[in-house]
């Protein structure tokens, strides 16, 4: 159980530093409500908030007494780690030692870059803990990645793919050291009670996917059924989530990668169509609140689409890019590039990353073993959890993304593989005058984050007119 207490000025100040404008917690009556200064209510402050030694303890934290050790610890196979991953393990062990000394909960956020190897590093930690653990995922796309990792360390496990009711029935017949679940399982209170009693470690993968200032299943679980040990895994942590896990370990990835961002600039003549004219009318309305119509119009930009195709075809034929992922915002845009590129290169080279395809995991598995391919998907599918370490190139066809989404997308090509060169290609110009400045603004945001935060080097290619020969001339690459 969380720490039930009145929120005095000092505690309120510490919580507000993290929460920002609005602070929401469960009160003693079970209501999820905003916390105001001098409230007469007592509130449940998550024990993970006190994982930081800088936060004074209101009262000793009570833990469940039972220990849930794994049954066959002698059979565990420790995974091989890179030196920078071993450094994370050392930092975690040092943090645990301090927490034990000060009687603080072992709640740690592993803030590690995309491509760092958070999954295998976490498996190493599980091997050291030798405690039963629950691995909680935001969606099923990540299941296979975790299943392979757990199998590699030889831990007994259950993967839940058929819902929490079926899992509860299976757990009556069989116990497992590791449960791999999706977060919606935590809506079931019977299941929450069961894992609270029978499992000691909880890993929340892709923790940035959850806003714990909302009354969600994960928020409620961490408040009412807090595990003994908890890890949040993310490349892009949400600040507000520190209220539930208030100690962060951040270690940089020292992989020797040569990373380039290629900016293909073109000065198009103005283009429009009846479809575009109709959508332009909605640009300054609530319909475009999340820039959906900006992206819809961009998808209809024929000259820009042709430039993107020319760039991809030229660079792929010249073997400047080899294992490529193309990302769009809209499914329609994705299908456009898939149809054109599959016609050009064939279905043995071009693959569709369609979340609606039940066999998508088989497609992802297949391209891992292919030397050269083009994989086309949406930002929604490929942003988090796409596990293709061999990717070396990324073409971004969309424009509007927040910083978290940008870093997740760029992270798809920052993993360790045989190739040491990584290339991102962006297109900051559009032939549609009504969205010209907006597209330029958001593309510059991508460029700035790639260079300043992820250490990409800039390559600029410029042109004046949309002419094929000129287009190809400016697509020459110098690395």
Swiss-Prot record:
Its main location: virion. Keywords: ATP-binding, DNA-binding, Helicase, Hydrolase, Late protein, Nucleotide-binding, Transcription, Virion. It comes from the Viruses. Residues 308-469 form the Helicase C-terminal domain. It is found in: Virion. One of its GO terms (cellular component) is virion component. PANTHER family: HELICASE A859L-RELATED, RAD25/XP-B DNA REPAIR HELICASE. DNA helicase which seems to act as a postreplicative transcription termination factor. Involved in ATP-dependent release of nascent RNA. Forms a stable complex with single-stranded DNA, and to a lesser extent RNA. This is Transcript termination protein A18. It comes from Yaba-like disease virus. The lineage of its organism: Viruses, Varidnaviria, Bamfordvirae, Nucleocytoviricota, Pokkesviricetes.
């Amino acid at each position: 159980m969380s720490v039930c207490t009145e929120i005095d000025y000092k505690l309120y100040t510490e919580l507000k530093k993290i929460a920002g404008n609005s602070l929401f917690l469960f009160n003693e009556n079970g209501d999820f409500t905003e916390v105001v200064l001098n409230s007469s209510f007592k509130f449940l402050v998550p024990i993970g908030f006190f994982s930081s030694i800088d936060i004074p303890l209101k009262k000793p934290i009570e833990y469940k007494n039972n220990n849930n050790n794994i049954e066959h610890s002698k059979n565990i196979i420790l995974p091989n780690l890179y030196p920078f991953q071993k450094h994370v393990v050392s930092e975690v062990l040092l943090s645990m030692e301090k927490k034990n000394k000060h009687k603080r909960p072992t709640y740690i956020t592993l803030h590690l870059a995309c491509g760092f190897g958070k999954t295998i590093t976490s498996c190493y930690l599980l091997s050291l803990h030798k405690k039963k653990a629950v691995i909680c995922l935001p969606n099923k796309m990540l299941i296979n990645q975790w299943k392979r990792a757990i199998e590699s360390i030889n831990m007994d496990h259950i993967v839940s793919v058929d819902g929490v009711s079926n899992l509860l029935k299976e757990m009556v017949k069989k116990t497992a050291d590791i449960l791999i679940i999706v977060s919606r399982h935590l809506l079931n209170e019977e299941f929450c009670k069961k894992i609270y009693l029978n499992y000691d470690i909880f890993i929340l993968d892709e923790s940035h996917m959850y806003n714990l200032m909302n009354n969600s299943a994960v928020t409620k679980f961490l408040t009412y059924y807090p595990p003994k040990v908890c890890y949040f895994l993310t490349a892009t942590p949400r600040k507000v989530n520190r209220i539930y896990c208030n100690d962060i370990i951040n270690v940089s990835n020292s992989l020797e990668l040569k990373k380039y961002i290629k900016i293909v600039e073109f000065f198009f003549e103005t283009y429009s169509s009846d479809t575009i004219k109709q959508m332009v009318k909605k640009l300054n309305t609530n319909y475009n609140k999340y820039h959906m119509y900006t992206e819809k119009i961009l998808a209809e930009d024929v000259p820009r689409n042709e430039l993107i195709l020319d760039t991809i075809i030229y660079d792929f034929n010249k073997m400047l890019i080899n294992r490529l992922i193309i990302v769009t915002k809209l499914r329609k845009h994705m299908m456009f590039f898939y149809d054109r590129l599959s016609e050009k290169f064939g279905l043995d080279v071009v693959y569709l990353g369609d979340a609606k395809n039940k066999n998508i995991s088989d497609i992802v598995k297949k391209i891992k073993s292919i030397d050269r391919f083009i994989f086309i998907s949406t930002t929604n599918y490929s942003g988090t959890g796409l596990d293709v370490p061999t990717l070396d190139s990324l073409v971004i066809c969309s424009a509007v993304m927040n910083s978290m989404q940008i870093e997740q997308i760029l992270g798809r090509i920052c993993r360790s593989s045989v190739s040491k060169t990584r290339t991102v290609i962006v297109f900051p110009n559009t032939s549609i005058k009504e969205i010209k400045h907006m597209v330029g603004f958001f593309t510059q945001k991508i460029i700035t984050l790639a260079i300043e935060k992820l250490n990409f080097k800039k390559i600029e290619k410029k042109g004046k007119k949309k002419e094929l020969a000129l287009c190809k001339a400016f697509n020459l690459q110098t690395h």
